[in-house]
A protein has these predicted regions:
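C-terminal recognition in membrane/secretory proteostasis and scaffolding
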Residues: 1-175
């Protein structure tokens, strides 16, 4: 159990050493392996669908997911230390719903998000907060691949958000 003490015996240079360790809870992982009893967090803005990366998401690419899932996301799973700096979770643009606000971006998907409206994206909460206020009259979302920055007109994206809710989408975000 977390907090319990564990006695260890170690051999070093032919000599026995006695050590004591306290069991700790493992640190929070950048990428959850699985989520139990909880739906994954998401944010939809103007037709852009953002999620926090999980192993379950990658496994949804099928039996051969380790070769079929997007390479950038697989790299993040296999080398999380390359993506950890300043992040609590890895947020990515999972897909683009074709809407008047997302014209030209419909082929952009499965890209890691680094910033939104000039704010560093550290988890879903930070993305949601950053997208509340556009900068210089536009929403800007920086991703780690071409086109590098996605621009959304705030009025058009708000109109799309209202339309999605009217068509039965239960919510634009879930934490």
């Amino acid at each position: 159990q977390v907090g319990d003490k564990l006695s260890l015996v170690n051999m070093r240079d032919g000599k026995e050493q006695k050590l004591e360790a306290v069991l700790r809870r493992p640190p929070e992982s950048l990428i959850h392996s699985h989520m139990y009893d909880k739906s994954p967090p998401y944010q939809i803005k103007g037709g852009l669908v953002f999620q926090e990366l999980t192993r379950s998401y990658l496994e949804a690419f099928g039996k051969e997911w380790q070769s079929r899932a997007p390479l950038d996301l697989l790299d993040a799973l296999n080398n999380p230390e390359d993506y950890e700096e300043g992040r609590k979770r890895l947020v990515f643009l999972s897909r683009v719903i074709r809407t008047p606000a997302t014209i030209g971006y419909d082929q952009v998907n499965n890209k890691i998000v680094t910033e939104a409206n000039g704010e560093k994206v550290t988890d879903m909460e930070s993305l949601i907060s950053a997208l509340k206020e556009p900068r210089d009259g536009l929403h800007s979302i920086r991703i780690d691949d071409v086109p590098y920055v996605i621009y959304l007109d705030p009025e058009a994206s708000d109109q799309v958000d209202r339309a999605l809710l009217q068509r039965g989408l239960p919510a634009l975000e879930r934490l």
